[in-house]
Amino acid sequence: MDRTVVEACFQGQPDLERTVTGQRTRDANVSQGGSGAGKVIDLSLAGQGNFVAKRGFLIEMVWFLIEAALINNKFNPVSGLRIWLLRRFGARIGTGCRMQHPIRVKAPWNLEVGDNCWFGVNAWIYNQAMIRIGSNVCISQDVFLTTGSHDLAKTMDLRVAPIVIEDGVWITSRCVVQMGVTIGRSSVVTPLSVVHRSLEAEGVYGGNPVRFIKKRFPL
């Protein structure tokens, strides 16, 4: 193959090492397998990316034990105890909130919740970055809120971004809300949806990937 043609194939990909002889490509973390094999990212080289820990190892371990014993425990029905413990570890939670059992919170110091919010059974708040939840929000059963992902194309480094859920939102059962998303005021997300982008206010959304269905409040 002509060398000029080969190099043209790699225009716009400055991070890749270009090798004309043998017609192979790779970067620092991506290796090319044998004949007919695809690329594989070396997970041993993955880093922390833009994640910055806000608490030391000891605090994180203490929280891990408390979460396992008292927060994520179906035999502890006391919502007030969960909220009290979360506040002791840095969560900002308003009045009138209810947390069903069990529930998981990875980092209470990265959690802000307004007033009169409901959290259903098995809700999972995986907040490596900040999650801000407004007032009068309902997070239903088995909802997964995750502020983390990975650089899937090159290094698998950790990537984090905050989630904002505005006042009056209802996220129904078994939905996933991904990093960097803002869900607008009084919106509804229907069951089993994957929210990969920000949503405007007062809409009903559903699906995987999520799409607009209709306005929540008819004119």
Identify the role of each PLM range:
Residues 1-91, 168, 186, 208-219:
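Terminal amphipathic alpha-helical/low-complexity segments used for targeting or macromolecular assembly
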Residues 52-55, 150-160, 187, 202:
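A short, terminal or domain-edge coil/loop segment
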Residues 71-72, 155, 173:
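A generic secondary-structure micro-motif detector
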Residues 76, 80, 84, 88, ...:
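Residues at secondary-structure transition points
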Residues 95, 100-101, 106-107, 114-115, ...:
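Left-handed beta-helix
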Residues 149, 155-157, 181, 215-217:
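Conserved catalytic-core motifs of eukaryotic protein kinase domains, centered on the activation segment
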